[in-house]
Amino acid sequence: MSRKSKKIKKKVFKDSKYDSQVIAKFVNRMMYDGKKFISESIVYNSIDMLAEKLEEVDKVAAFNKALDNVKPLVEVRSRRVGGATYQVPVEVREERREALAMKWIISAARKASGKSMQEKLANELVNSYNSTGAAFKKREDTHRMAEANRAFTHYRW
C-alpha cells in the first residue's frame, strides 16, 4: 500500500464574467507570470470574437463545444515489458481530457503567426468548433496512434 497521502484537489473558482469554471481554468492556463488581468482580457475578447464569427447566441456553449471537439478519448502511454517498450493505449480521465484540450488549443494559437493573441485564439476556437485546425489535428493524431497500437491493450495497468 502506498505511503503517500492522497493529493487534495485545489478548487478553481468560477470566472466573474461568464460564471463558468471551465473558462476560469482556461484563463489560468493562458496566464504568464501571474498576469491574470491580461489573460482574462485575451480569453474574453476571443470568446466574443468566436461568438461573432459563428453568429452564436450562447458564448459559453460555443466555447464548450469547441473544447469538447478537441478532447481526446484515448492516448498512448509507454510501458516497459521485458526489454521492449510498448506504446499502450489508455482511456483518458475526464479532468485530463479537459486539460489536454485546453493545452492543445492554447499551444496551437501561440504557434500561429501574425495577428494579436486574441485573434489567433479566436481563430483556433472557431477551427476547434468546426472540427478542423491544429488542435483538432493533434487529437486525431493521438487517436490514430492509439488505434495503431491497439494490439498492446492487454499491457494496461
UniProtKB/Swiss-Prot annotation:
Gene3D superfamilies assigned to the protein according to its UniProt record, in alphabetical order: Ribosomal protein S7 domain
GO terms under biological process: translation
Organism from which the protein derives: Borrelia duttonii (strain Ly)
InterPro entries (UniProt xref): Ribosomal_uS7, Ribosomal_uS7_bac/org-type, Ribosomal_uS7_CS, Ribosomal_uS7_dom, Ribosomal_uS7_dom_sf
Record gene name: rpsG
UniProt keyword list: Ribonucleoprotein, Ribosomal protein, RNA-binding, rRNA-binding, tRNA-binding
Complex and partners: Part of the 30S ribosomal subunit. Contacts proteins S9 and S11.
Record-given protein name: Small ribosomal subunit protein uS7
Highest taxon above the source species: Bacteria
Family matches, as SUPFAM superfamilies: Ribosomal protein S7 (SSF47973)
Entry annotated with the keyword Signal: no
Function noted in UniProt: One of the primary rRNA binding proteins, it binds directly to 16S rRNA where it nucleates assembly of the head domain of the 30S subunit. Is located at the subunit interface close to the decoding center, probably blocks exit of the E-site tRNA.
A GO term, aspect molecular function: tRNA binding
A cellular-component GO term for this protein: small ribosomal subunit
